Amino acid sequence: MLNIVLFEPEIPPNTGNIIRLCANTGCQLHLIKPLGFTWDDKRLRRAGLDYHEFADIKHHHDYQAFLDSEKLDSTQPARLFALTTKGTPAHSAVSYQANDYLLFGPETRGLPAYILDALPAQQKIRIPMQADSRSMNLSNAVSVVVYEAWRQLGYPGALLKE
């Protein structure tokens, strides 16, 4: 199972859409606080529809609590990929493995330097875009990367019709 990690997400409909994505792809969702909304926000519920009960969601007090809980060592982060416009390899150049962690920053500011600086260059990846584009919508970016990783893994758990 792939792991989607949202660091301090700010916009409830984006997180709701990602909850629905997790329910449909079997990904586990990790939410690192503080969140920019309350967990009972109507916009979050509306975007996620009734998929909340089908998604595996873990809340973490902060980034260090996430690393500790998931037994990831920030000095040797194994299979933790940060999505950033500052990354070099494209998301499609990674050979994904089950249980990889895909880390996304908040919508308005991206991941902080202390997180990016702790990761090796090959674990800071980007989604290719036009040169004059700043970034993609968070829920769209998560979908792009998750479906590429899931495709590489052979869509485990998916209902495929040949």
Curated annotation (Swiss-Prot):
GO CC term (a single one): cytoplasm
Keywords: Cytoplasm, Methyltransferase, S-adenosyl-L-methionine, Transferase, tRNA processing
Disulfide links within the chain: none
Record's subunit section: Homodimer.
Catalytic activity: cytidine(34) in tRNA + S-adenosyl-L-methionine = 2'-O-methylcytidine(34) in tRNA + S-adenosyl-L-homocysteine + H(+); 5-carboxymethylaminomethyluridine(34) in tRNA(Leu) + S-adenosyl-L-methionine = 5-carboxymethylaminomethyl-2'-O-methyluridine(34) in tRNA(Leu) + S-adenosyl-L-homocysteine + H(+)
Sequence similarity: Belongs to the class IV-like SAM-binding methyltransferase superfamily. RNA methyltransferase TrmH family. TrmL subfamily.
Protein name: tRNA (cytidine(34)-2'-O)-methyltransferase
Source organism: Yersinia pestis
E.C. numbers: 2.1.1.207
Binding site for S-adenosyl-L-methionine: 83, 105, 127, 135
GO molecular function, one term: RNA binding
